[in-house]
């Protein structure tokens, strides 16, 4: 090796050590940068040139070079990270929703639905103890109205949670589409850079970050392909493949929300990621608890109404064709025969003497409708002014009612669960078909005298009906049990999701620790490497100084 060859070797060392120092400095600078992967300089020996014919070579080499910059990344760990983070995001989402549902009901509580149902039975008990007192009846109506309002509010809050999550899911879909398009562009840049022989490590960091984001949002799977590009798949759809991306859309037009591929419109089965958690909340969790709350409301309605106005026989109410205002129109089917429509006009159920007038009109209409049939229908006026309709022989009969105007109250009398109120029959205490429209009947609300405290005909001081309802407080069935079962199920479901969420968090933490141990920056290690590169740089510089001194001596020796 000539002296000038030594200078060339020293120069290559200076350049290589300087490059290694720059890489180490970049690692330290990005130690806290999300998605950054630790890099290191790969140094290789520069082989000496092939000697010419009849010449020799020492074979010592011609120095050093940085042949590549390596990213410390495990592709298998990245794939596992996408899967595990997607599962965690789904559980986090549902766990948060379950917490909101629990907070919504707020049980146990002195003001919750459970306590208010108990207060309702206590209010009935107070009416039973003093049935003639309008004040206790007013308190009962206030308690019933408060309970109905609380049930309505809970139902509305559950529906609002679903609406809110649907809006969030729509925004998430837009984020997925933007991220997919960005990843496709990065894939293209990586391919172009790799072909050109450029350093694409920074682009690969961006690629991995975008791919992990898609996995966390949707539960998509990640697969690395050729030229360091990735393919991201979701439910049979390639969200991203090389430099192409597909967009998603949220479809809420059906009974369930579903994600669809914008191109082709086919539905995607998304069960993981934040989107999977949201879809589970929107389609299953929230509707499930709303249905359970509907069951509580309907059970309470029937529990109270059935006690207030027991009725024998099988008279079922249903709508018929609309009739003119002030006209009662109903159909009567006896012993399986054809239904006959009967109209009673001009009878005002709401006014004084209305029951008697309606009795006459209804009896005449029924007799005409039955004609020569093998059944009879008898309308009688009770001592308290209410009407009774008796159909004989017993069997399955259908009495359909359509009422309007002043006669609207009569429809309740002939309903499937009509009520007696101090002998004034035909008024349901609770109405509604679900938790959203559950309410105190308009015929009772604001009218304490309409509260059925006793059996029709026993007088206004009979409190037997209210007493029976008050005793519901010790019942092991009914609305109390239905609501208690719902709250217990809510607690178990929430605990189950929370437990699975905690276990998944531990799995993700272990996986992330393994990823960070390989790809993360250890500043102590980098500082040690920098000292090593610096010393090597100083040694190379010292070598240059030594060669310079040797050349100077040699030149002076052979000089004039």
Predicted regions and their residues:
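S/T-rich, low-complexity, solvent-exposed segments of bacterial secretion/appendage proteins
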Residues: 1-560
